[in-house]
Amino acid sequence: MPRLTETPLQLLEPRTGTAAVPTQFGVPWPRGAMPQSPQFDLVDASGSTPVDTWVAARWPDGSVKWTGHAGCAPAGDARLVAADGKEGTAATTAPRTGVVVEVSEQADGSIDVDTGVLRVVIAPHDGAPLRHLEVDGRLVGQDGRLIASSAASPGSGASRREHRVRTTAAGIERRGEQQVVVRLEGHHEVAGERVFPFVLRLYATAGSRRLRAVHSLVWDADPESLFLTSLGLRMEVPLRSAPHDRHVRLAGSEGGFLTEAVRGLTGLRRDPGAEVREAQIAGAATPPVESWAPEVSRRLHLIPTWNDWTLRQLSAHGYTLAKRTAGDRPWIPAASGTRSQGYAYLGDLEGGIGMGLRDFWKLVPTQLDITGAATEHGAVTTWLHAPSAEPMDLRFYH
């Protein structure tokens, strides 16, 4: 069979926008068509993009059967091309220039990953292993951790016990020029028992601000005595701007978003000014307060600040969204819909954190929480099992 040096690729899912995004994919090769594994580039109309390549399987004759690839994929269809057009030559193994992922292991056991725009410090022995995230040198997130709770009985009124989630090991599972995978291992501790061994993989890609997390958990507890009541990933967000320059985004259904500020300046009885309103709606910095209409600037302290938002997808057919000004204040219904796309963002003029859960509405009961938005330390939580839902009951049904 003739040797192949390229193959066409087609996106299976439509993608909005034109920016390249991190991706991992596999390519099958006919028997004998790829004797060795070269470096590859993704090539489209805008140019070529390097990707990491590894052999996932071989044919009995030793030729490559499957290759795995990771990097930033272009927004449209592309071709996977051997870096020099000739697979298996010495030239294909030479280092390539451009943005690469840098990773280092520190003396204290922490792991420092830098994609060129995103820096992540992972401290496996901390209670919050995602110590901090920086974008372009600015701190945007800190103290990221898994959280969970359970009950000893299945009733909705049963007392809930907070789990202590411990990370016991961390290491670099795959190190490439374009992508690094960090593997965290640990377990939960509850009521004196060690349960739920888990693996959390973090994928960081060169030139990207995105950090992908894949969580795997083994259920090894007694289903007759342990009922999971919540399981989620939380990231704290430092907030430095004034409340009217802090912003919240929550994804609804069919591409819609709830877009609000912590202290809203639109729809008021008094108008702060068109420039102020337009800036806040756009998520940009508002003009100095002194330039606002005095009827608003003098009464700014009377405009409520919203502290918490919750989006609950408790069935595949509908979600509800509510918000409140403080923990001792009532929840105010804000929106509802069918199938949320499962994304939440909290940030200010210095940056913020957006978290999304793939197949959000298919994994019900799920939930997104934004908390502490009116304080100096907010948080975004993605719930794999919503705390507002009934406890997870894994007992045999008869």
Language model: regions and residue ranges:
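Surface-exposed beta-strand/loop patches in extracellular or lumenal glycoproteins
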Residues: 11-36, 227-237
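Beta-strand/loop-rich accessory regions of lumenal/periplasmic or secreted enzymes
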Residues: 69, 106-398
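Conserved structural-core and active-site-/substrate-pathway-adjacent residues in large, well-folded domains
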Residues: 40, 77-79, 117, 215
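Solvent-exposed beta-hairpin/edge-strand motifs
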Residues: 28-47, 234-251
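Short Pro-Gly-centered flexible turn/kink motifs
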Residues: 74-85, 395-398
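Short beta-strand elements of extracellular/lumenal beta-sandwich folds
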Residues: 2-17, 214-220
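Solvent-exposed beta-strand/loop surfaces of large extracellular or lumenal domains
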Residues: 37, 42-66, 397
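Terminal connector regions
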Residues: 87-115
